[in-house]
Regions:
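Short, charged low-complexity linear motifs
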Residues: 2-3, 51
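Residue-level recognition of oxygen-bearing side chains
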Residues: 9, 54, 88
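PIN-domain endoribonuclease scaffold, especially VapC-family toxins
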Residues: 5, 25-33
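Enriched for short, Lys/Arg-rich terminal
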Residues: 3, 12-25, 61-91
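Short alpha-helical linear motifs
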Residues: 30, 51-54, 69-72
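A short, surface-exposed loop/turn module that caps and links secondary-structure elements
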Residues: 34-59
Length: 91
């Protein structure tokens, strides 16, 4: 099991995401639980990012929405950075 660390940006974006997408609140909460239990589960579609976001990873909430994160396997820690639409989090 991993420890989730919410960055200040993630706290703001998670609140905004939940308010603007109430229909996805349960799905978002389930994704966070799944990340905490095992971020390598295939349905999360964990992938590393490239370019200026190199060093970060992303998982899917739905087809259009992503959570960006830093995965520290040795420390069993995941730092959550942002959540939002594909184009928003990859800007």
């Amino acid at each position: 099991m991993y420890r989730l660390v919410w960055s200040s940006l993630f706290s703001r974006s998670a609140k905004r995401f939940s308010q603007s997408h109430p229909e996805l609140r349960q799905r978002f909460a389930q994704v966070l639980r799944d990340i905490e239990n095992d971020p390598l589960q295939p349905h999360l579609r964990l992938h590393s990012l490239k370019g200026r976001m190199q060093g970060l990873h992303a998982v899917s909430v739905t087809y259009n929405y992503r959570v960006t994160l830093t995965l520290n396997v040795t420390e069993q820690e995941i730092i959550l950075h942002d959540v939002g639409a594909h184009d928003e989090v990859y800007e």
